[in-house]
Structures are given as C-alpha cells and as structure tokens.
C-alpha cells in the first residue's frame, strides 16, 4: 500500500492502481469520456487530466494512465487542470457542436461556444474515444471496427467501409458509445447497427415459444460455438426458458 494526497485528502491505495481508480473509490469526481473500468486504460480524451506534484515539481498527467506512488500529491481542479480541460472541451465542441452530451459537459466546464467550426465536421457525433473499438476487441473478442485515417479524417469504421464479417450484431459498440455516434435499431425481425458512414443488417432469432425476435442469429451462433453449446440451445429466448 502507498499513501497519496488528492485535493488535500490523505488516501491509501494499492500500488497497481491508477490515480483515477483511487479517486473514484473515494468519491472524488474526475470527468472522463474514454474510460471504462472493464477495458484497458487508453488515455484518448485527456479529460481526466490532473496536476501531480512530487519533489517540488508539478506536471499534468492523464489520471486513467498514471499509477499511484508513495507521497504523490494530486490536484483535480487546479487552475492548470481547469484550463486544460476547458481547452479540450473547446476542441470537442468544435468537432461535435450539435451533440447533446458534449454540449452539456462543455457547459458544465464553462464552455458555451466552440472557438471555430470546420465544415468537414458537420453533424459529427464521434469523439474518437475508442470505446467501441476496444469493447469489440477486448470484451466481444472480435475486430469488426477500428480507428482509420489520420488528422481531421480520423474516424471509426469497418475495413474498407464495408460490412465486416467480424461483426455479429451484438450492439456492444452502440451501447458503450458515450455520444450516440453508433446506433442500433431492431424492427420487423431485423437489427441494423450503423454509424455515419457504415451500417450492417442482421436477421434476428425468433423464439419458438413466444414468437418474439430477441437476438441476432450471428451473435447467437458465435456464442454457441465459443461455448460448445447444443445446436438448439438458442431456439427459446431467455424469458421462455
């Protein structure tokens, strides 16, 4: 165990923990957009930046990536931190000026208008946090989408912007997306997972008991093979089992 100081509070932490983990365990709020406790730390959004001091020197670090160490002093809302977060929110608001999640978070940090508004980001919702890509790979065990291109053309997409054979229609990407950039609709026995520049449709499995459509056939077949389940295991939905 090590002892650190966050905003004047002396706290004990395990050596392998990050500053963000310790802060959350102790009810100290640090904003994030790209972090999830079930995924490996990524440090994309930088909203979780804090100011650390040790040995008379201070610097700004991403709290989701920085491991705690004995005697570390952390400030989560110093003038440097607040200024840094405001700049990040200005850039995010410039990219996603009409997204309600970003507008609300920006407003909380005192940012009401973006400093500029490029036309190539018109109606953009994706903040490039990478949550969808990492969830697909780390949790689902697939690689249906990835971050492609560079600079202002950076975006999330399947290979060649074509429906990916790796996509099973589970919808985990849509569920984890913090801004609604990826969407999922179920209608008339079909599921559609889509974003701004790509989409894929899936046939839903129909329960043999209640007759309701309840999950994509590709997803169920993937699970069945992975767990070596009987061929008829998913003929009945969970509600009717």
Set out the residue ranges of the language-model regions.
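A basic, amphipathic helix-loop patch mediating RNA/tRNA/ribosome contacts
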Residues: 20, 26-50
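Short, contiguous acidic and Ser/Thr-rich linear segments
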Residues: 10-17
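Fe-S ferredoxin-like electron-transfer domains
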Residues: 57-166, 185-217, 224-240
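Extreme N-terminal starter segment of soluble prokaryotic enzymes
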Residues: 1-3
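Short, structural beta-strand-to-alpha-helix junction motif
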Residues: 17-21, 67
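Loop-centered beta-sheet repeat module
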Residues: 161-175, 179
